[in-house]
């Protein structure tokens, strides 16, 4: 399956008034959220219809609230220059579900994001719908060095790279390079402390997850390392957001 953070590439260009953009982004990653709850790439509930409603959707609402109310403003103001200035205008954008219409828009936007995720995975995982029904995706081809690789695996890795590039391009286009106001500009010391909190927290989470998995005799591979690292960074950013 493609890297979780590449999945928003499928929805970033749907940014308009008909959709809740936060819900689209979170929804596009939501089927993988169960991995982060498990601290390893294990569990399939998030990719099932039932999981869309009992797991993914509640997590999308919770994460949207946490991001907009606690993380967004401190994160942007602690970005290195000129990024803090480029994206400073986003700090004032309001988020809330204050009416039934806004709730409905959030829900169908999140669900659309989840559908794009599952469809994408369907082409890139051995148990994916399209991989199971399209024979040539299960065939092997020879790549550099004479190594053989399944076509669906090649699609997975290639689409991940393309997805990340699209996301980065979108973020670049989202900037406001004409901004001259320093939106809550932070000093080097403030940014250093913020980053230090994130790094230390991420290391602690990573070490603790390794110790716990070893204690429980659960195999600890590269997937665990990646998921635990992302968890640690997120927790670190959340903690750092409350620093004075």
Regions found by a protein language model. Give the residues of each.
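N-terminal membrane-targeting hydrophobic helices
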Residues: 1-244
């Amino acid at each position: 399956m493609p890297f979780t953070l590449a999945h928003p590439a499928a929805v970033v260009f749907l940014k308009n008034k008909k959709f809740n953009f936060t819900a689209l982004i979170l929804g596009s990653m939501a089927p993988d959220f169960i991995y982060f709850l498990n601290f390893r790439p294990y569990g399939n509930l998030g990719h099932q219809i039932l999981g869309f409603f009992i797991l993914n959707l509640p997590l999308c609402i919770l994460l949207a609230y946490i991001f907009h109310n606690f993380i967004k403003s401190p994160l942007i103001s602690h970005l290195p220059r000129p990024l803090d200035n480029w994206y400073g205008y986003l700090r004032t954008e309001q988020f809330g579900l204050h009416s039934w219409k806004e709730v409905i828009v959030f829900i169908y936007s999140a669900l659309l994001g989840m559908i794009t995720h599952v469809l994408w995975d369907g082409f890139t995982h051995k148990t994916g719908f399209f991989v199971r029904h399209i024979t040539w995706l299960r065939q092997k081809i020879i790549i550099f060095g004479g190594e053989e690789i399944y076509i669906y695996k090649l699609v997975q890795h290639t689409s991940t790279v393309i997805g990340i590039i699209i996301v980065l391009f979108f973020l670049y286009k989202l900037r406001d390079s004409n901004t001259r106001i320093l939106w809550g500009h932070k000093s080097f010391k403030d940014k250093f402390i913020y980053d230090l909190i994130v790094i230390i927290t991420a290391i602690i989470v990573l070490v603790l997850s390794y110790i716990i998995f070893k204690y429980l005799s659960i195999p600890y591979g590269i997937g665990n390392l990646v998921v635990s690292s992302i968890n640690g960074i997120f927790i670190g950013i959340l903690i750092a957001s409350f620093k004075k």
